[in-house]
Amino acid sequence: MRGDSERIAVGVVGTGGMGGMHAENLHFRVPGARLVAVADLDTRRAGGVAERSGAEVFEDGFDLIRSDRVEAVVIASPDPTHAPLVLECLKNEKPVLCEKPLADSADAARKVVEAEVELGRKLVQVGFMRRYDPQHVAVKEAVASGAVGAPVLFRGWHRNADIEPGITSEWVVINATIHDIDSARWFIEEEIEEVYVRGMNTAPKLGANVWDLQLIQFTTAGGRLGSIETNVVSGYGYEVGVEIVGERGTVQVPPLSGAIVRRGFAASQRIEDGWLARFHAAYVIEMQGWVGALLRGEAPAGPDAWDGYASLVVADACIASLRSGAPQKVETLEPPTLYRRDVEVTG
């Protein structure tokens, strides 16, 4: 175990919007971390991110992972690179916080799970940051306390203001809805058993075959019900909401976080323009928690490789339903011992 005065040497792979934000948080807002390296094919952009911290710049993320200077890794590079980079971290036995999705397919994510199980200890955390958002945490605690009785219905909505052309209907599931899939699993604490997804195009600029508005209905292994609305071109701002209906009441994550101003016979409330602003605190808390666990010599306590894999299994079923127009069964999942909450794993 490390002393409290020591800091973890962290490298960040990918210095776009997400990676740049993580690097800034590590340098300015996570006292237990030292940002020692960043990697990006765009070394000029990486250099800009590294300038204030003096971090070493790499062009190749694999070289950063192999560097003796780097003790732990944050991956925020394009989705197809996630699984290969995480596997390299496992090969080098370095803790890694990987942005969602863990991989670009369930098959690729399963290989990560298999590699970590073979290693025999948990080193992977997946960036489902909503689990750290104070509002989501408050609702989770209310549900866990039994305040509304056992949950019977999950209702989630996820709306972006706008998006540039170039996305696909599948992208909406893998990149946006994946957060809501994880939220449903986290709040209800059951695996999703069946999904039925319908979509429509509300933004011709994206192409007629792109369904930017999607509605998922699902049932869980225990018979709970759920719905998820994803709208990536809402036109009015960024909004995420969750309502849990219990046997004796409901509890809700407020969709908007800004102050309500009442004046001149009207009330107004600011709506954020994107997820970085809405979940800024969650990203900081997530990173502080991850680094704190590493400093204590503990396995990351956040969403793990199994959560990343399970969410992608559901996402793949959603895509199949979207294409077929019919309900789709989700592959039955049984977590290995390493990921079971009811089993203490040592090593």
UniProtKB/Swiss-Prot annotation:
Pfam families: GFO_IDH_MocA (PF01408), GFO_IDH_MocA_C3 (PF22725). Its EC number is 1.1.1.18. GO terms for biological process: inositol catabolic process. Homotetramer. Keywords: NAD, Oxidoreductase. This is Inositol 2-dehydrogenase. It catalyses: myo-inositol + NAD(+) = scyllo-inosose + NADH + H(+). The keyword Oxidoreductase applies. The gene is iolG. Involved in the oxidation of myo-inositol (MI) to 2-keto-myo-inositol (2KMI or 2-inosose). SUPFAM superfamilies: Glyceraldehyde-3-phosphate dehydrogenase-like, C-terminal domain (SSF55347), NAD(P)-binding Rossmann-fold domains (SSF51735). Belongs to the Gfo/Idh/MocA family. Gene3D superfamilies: Dihydrodipicolinate Reductase, domain 2, NAD(P)-binding Rossmann-like Domain. InterPro entries: Gfo-Idh-MocA_inositol_DH, Gfo/Idh/MocA-like_OxRdtase_N, GFO_IDH_MocA-like_dom, MI/DCI_dehydrogenase, NAD(P)-bd_dom_sf. GO terms for molecular function: inositol 2-dehydrogenase (NAD+) activity; nucleotide binding.
